[in-house]
Amino acid sequence: MTSRALYSTRSQLCRHLAHKYLSRSYSTRPSLNEVVIVSAVRTPIGSFKGSLSTLPATKLGSIAIKGAIDKAGIPVEEVKEVYMGNVLQAGEGQAPTRQALLGAGLPLSTPATTINKVCASGMKSIMLASQSLMCGHQDVMVAGGMESMSQVPYIMAREAPPYGGVKMEDLIVKDGLTDVYNKFHMGNCAENTAKNSSISREEQDAFAIKSYTLSKAAWESGILAKEVVPVSIPQRGKPDVVVKEDEEYRKVDFSKVPKLKAVFLKENGTVTAANASTLNDGAAALVLMTADAAQRLNVTPLAKIVAFADAAVAPIDFPIAPAFAVPKVLKAAGIKKEDIAMWEINEAFSVVVLANIKMLDIDPDRVNINGGAVSLGHPIGMSGARIVGHMVHNLKSGQYGLAGICNGGGGASSIVIQKF
């Protein structure tokens, strides 16, 4: 071979290797997996010290996780990891989600992580699981949330007082319902939002009555029953009591709603026990997987994860944080608010939903169409997962649903799904 021919051959080889190795680094980008929801269930929601109060959050979580896997129709061994939201963890024991998944019969080899983003914990669990599935770290996961507010303990300081009595603190209030920056109850933040947004007591009461009315109608029509798995409560020497229905929505007397005193502001206060959410017990869980895993397991997906986003504002303004998360998730999804057929904005307080409807300029008739936390209850680690699961069951084919939930500290999470 002549030197010229050898040079030509070497040049061709160099160009081939450059194309093979160098161009690959610059011309290709990894694609994310499509994530689908194949089941979504929840327990009934129990009233504070009510029907579910004897069961710890971890047991409620077990029931929801098992129910979701059973509905999906897949072997428990297929679940590679579990994320569950849980806020008030004191006294539950180590690794609450680990307890919940083992109680649901999952293998000892299944990893678990507990998520605490206050009221957004259940939704954030879904978001984090979706990220893991999108990136290919796992292919089948369970995500949701659980809370037993009835079993939250009181605490006292470890130091012995030099003189006088011992002060006990309620961890529901301290860890769940107090703005740590302003040193007051979340209800005071709601009052601040009502004032700044010019939302009256009458508007909040009307919204609460509507929430109770819608929840009652949804139960009577069977809409809510399809997302609920029964809970059996063991009894001493008697048959188990089976709880199949939410407890809170029946506990209302509409004639008393306008007569109740404001709870947080004595003068010109607007937030009452009726137009705020209640303390509750319950759990929700969803089975998520990649589209490839759904095909492999011969599972029919119900909906797909389109996009999700978080936002943060001043802690006192937490009630309006969803109004900042929603534009971000719409942009990420590449759609407009007019494309959303169903909105779920968590009813921590009636004023939360009213303020966000006003700020986002959305149709109130598409928001919380079957009631919400004011009437159904708000187990704080569960609610974010509950509202996502509710959309899964109630959207029609091809429709988009958007759920948003505020959280203490001045935050919110939001998610868009599309029904198959």
From Swiss-Prot:
PROSITE patterns: THIOLASE_1, THIOLASE_2, THIOLASE_3
Site (Increases nucleophilicity of active site Cys): H378
Pathway the protein acts in: Lipid metabolism; fatty acid beta-oxidation
Known EC number: 2.3.1.9
Catalytic activity: 2 acetyl-CoA = acetoacetyl-CoA + CoA; propanoyl-CoA + acetyl-CoA = 2-methyl-3-oxobutanoyl-CoA + CoA
Name of one Pfam family that matches: Thiolase_N
Record: active site: C119, C406
InterPro entries: Thiolase, Thiolase-like, Thiolase_acyl_enz_int_AS, Thiolase_AS, Thiolase_C, Thiolase_CS, Thiolase_N
Cellular compartments annotated: Mitochondrion
Any one Gene Ontology cellular component term annotated for this protein: mitochondrion
GO biological process, one term: fatty acid beta-oxidation
UniProt KW Lipid metabolism keyword: yes
Enzyme class: transferase
Transit peptide: 1-26
Subcellular location, principal: mitochondrion
PANTHER family for this protein: ACETYL-COA ACETYLTRANSFERASE, MITOCHONDRIAL, ACETYL-COA C-ACYLTRANSFERASE
Family: Belongs to the thiolase-like superfamily. Thiolase family.
Protein's UniProt name: Acetyl-CoA acetyltransferase, mitochondrial
Gene name of the encoded protein: acat1
